């Protein structure tokens, strides 16, 4: 199995990031996990770096000599615009600008269904529909997709944008329509890293089931 010299994971203390740490550590010689909040015990080949995404200098320092960047760090809900602006919008700019400076060739980005959240609930949509964000949070994820597209077109930085629906335990039949299992999330991320060619792609993060409108 090929092992990458260095993978950087942002948002490592979050619910989704915490599930990705161990799988990412298995395909890397060194996993650098970052977040504002410290993680628990680190894995054998993992180091933790405290990081605020809005701090360009710190982002640039951490991304030096990085092979793959898995960007799951964000203000993860709707909230005050200033907080979303700093973590999600300025943070996304810092991520891609520093990826360019450090010659990182591939980014895996946690986008959200909220980037297209204004479509009707029963309307079937695909990855080609126009963005219709429903919140400032969704707007920030739309920005992340757009800056990823720009850096692919201008600089050749590959990116998979995963529009995650809901990656949590199933609590009802209705919740199956948006459910992404943790195992499927891990498979998406790992396979997108291993792909020989990726380019720029947007996919929906949802597990296969009959109730989904995606």
Please annotate each region the language model reported.
Residues 5-27:
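N-terminal Rossmann NAD(P)H-binding glycine-rich loop of SDR-like oxidoreductase domains
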Residues 28-40:
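Conserved glycine-rich Rossmann-like NAD(P)H-binding loop of the short-chain dehydrogenase/reductase
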Residues 40, 51-87:
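NAD(P)H-binding glycine-rich loop region in Rossmannoid oxidoreductase-like domains
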Residues 54, 83-94, 131, 139-142, ...:
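Glycine-rich NAD(P)-binding loop of the Rossmann-fold in SDR/ketoreductase-type enzymes
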Residues 86, 120-159:
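Catalytic helix-loop patch of NAD(P)-dependent Rossmann-fold dehydrogenases
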Residues 94-132:
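Conserved Rossmann-fold NAD(P)-dependent oxidoreductase catalytic core, especially the SDR/UDP-sugar
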Residues 136, 157-177:
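Flexible, glycine-rich beta-alpha linker
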Residues 164-169, 179-201, 208:
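Alpha-helical substrate-binding/gating segment
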